[in-house]
């Protein structure tokens, strides 16, 4: 029995060892199919990252599918039951790195697109794909650079589905219509190193950081709102000491992260943190890394179209959610586009034996096709 079109395409994509930022020919494979559908394909290479902007049509509205061909490293391949770049079907699941995150999303949209254009060659508006090989890496030469290019030439996306694995138990049970912002701090607290037996001659940075860290961890940053939970503060790394039991360290290095709602801005968080550090009279340096602002797509044309398509395919009433980590949607939403994330289940993403349920894959094709029909016919 031969593979279905979406399964065959997904196997082809998974077999390419596209560990970030490598693309390994995945985008050329997509181009070969998109050009047959009348897409103009533009490859944008920035440093070590390969990006694809493909567009069919010039009219509004512009519907875009966004995704990434890069995958995270496998870890020790001997820990995998099946080789991670040799896609293997077992008991209704396809195993391989990128099976869920997110080559399945790309494959499903391509097949849905082929079906849609065959039936609606004169569809309304325009369709585009924005594909990068930089989503799992430092994300500096991928989607953000393509969006900058589009903005410079006033090419505006109206609707965007990002194909990240949004679902939990069954495809379509959850879609992401927003994400929290992310802000990371690398804090160094300076002390005075010395012998542990002479406390009057040292200043222990571990001791001096306890007060401000306790205050930061116990603070209510906001109450959240109808779309977002309250802002969270978490210490992610703490390093101090020489390893010797008789030496007080000269510095402590602490990394912490905020996942914040639309009730706050990065500037507001930074100001409050600095005020606490100064109140405790610390000798410190701090470096901030801004990973993206929170965004929300209000219920409207896009969320309605996707939700109705999901219900029509599998009878599920989808949940709109803003939980989880950041994605490239954070670079697209600020342009004014309506953005949601829709993809397969996320239980095995980044794990050994990553997999996707083949039945979910087939349903995802139908959901994408119906969404296109609702928005562009």
From Swiss-Prot:
CC cofactor note: Binds 2 Zn(2+) or Co(2+) ions per subunit.
Pfam families: M20_dimer (PF07687), Peptidase_M20 (PF01546)
Signal peptide: none
Gene3D superfamilies: Zn peptidases
Purpose of the protein: Catalyzes the hydrolysis of N-succinyl-L,L-diaminopimelic acid (SDAP), forming succinate and LL-2,6-diaminopimelate (DAP), an intermediate involved in the bacterial biosynthesis of lysine and meso-diaminopimelic acid, an essential component of bacterial cell walls.
Quaternary data: Homodimer.
Family: Belongs to the peptidase M20A family. DapE subfamily.
Protein name: Succinyl-diaminopimelate desuccinylase
Organism (species): Psychromonas ingrahamii (strain DSM 17664 / CCUG 51855 / 37)
